[in-house]
Amino acid sequence: MTAAATVAALVLAGIVAGATPRLTVQPTSIARGGVVTVSGKGCRAGDLAYLISPPFVGNAFVAHSVATRARSNGSFSRRVHIRTSIHAGRYLITARCGGGNLGVSARLRVY
């Protein structure tokens, strides 16, 4: 398969799935050692979604990542513990599923 055909297949798969990727975090501001819920959509049903951010406790894909499985509608949600040793600041949360980046992010403030 050529590179153009691969890209076209990926674009078509996204259109067929009809899911505009989304990623949210609640609450958006948390104390060190707290727990947040990261939710999103845009994965294929059954895919593992990897949630990645420096404050996260976990090593599912890379350091500071956790995993959850996408539901039949492509949505996912996971409660995530925040490291107690992280510096206060603003952090980006990203997600991967189906072998690539979801292409969206959420922001979290840790105090």
PLM regions and their residue ranges:
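Extracytoplasmic/secretory-pathway segments with low complexity and glycosylation-like composition
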Residues: 1-111
